Amino acid sequence: LRGGYSITRTGGAWAAKYGKKIIAWDNAPRPEYFDELFRVSKQQIIWGGNYFDLPPCRCFLIWNKPNIPTDFTMAQCEFAWCSLNENAKLISLSSTRSKGAKHWHPTEKPIGLYDWIFRLFCHPGDKILDTHLGSGNSRKAAYDAGLDFIGFEVDPEYYAKGCADFDAYAAQQSLFRQMAAESAGEQLCLL
């Protein structure tokens, strides 16, 4: 036990079973990771926190995935350990795995999940640190919410895909915002 938490092996079994690549994030972070995370951040939300012996908390975030069948190998919900002094929170939100959609990250979380978290806990001027960027949906939600964002990803391939995906997303959002502003301007001219 170090710093109030211990580390155990996590993940990798599902990926190996289905022929997916196993990378560094399939293993539990080292104790130094948690030491540094708690040092540099005021509050923490740690997805998969139920796999680590972290300090006791009041606020677990629970993401219920109503579209996952009971006989499927994926979890029907995910837990995030949360350092905030709040009651536990639950959101029911379909996973990002929709038929025909292309997904390139095995643990992708929907943008709507991060939108919900940021609406609950963030304030203007807050900075988001995501040390497990993955698909980059947390970055997209932070962009939409106007929050400052810093993200890290251990896998160079996922990082490159996530950056390209974010650039396309931001360009699309900018176009929508520009069209909305022009439309609002046209409406004002008609009045």
Model-assigned labels for residue ranges:
Residues 1-191:
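Class I S-adenosyl-L-methionine
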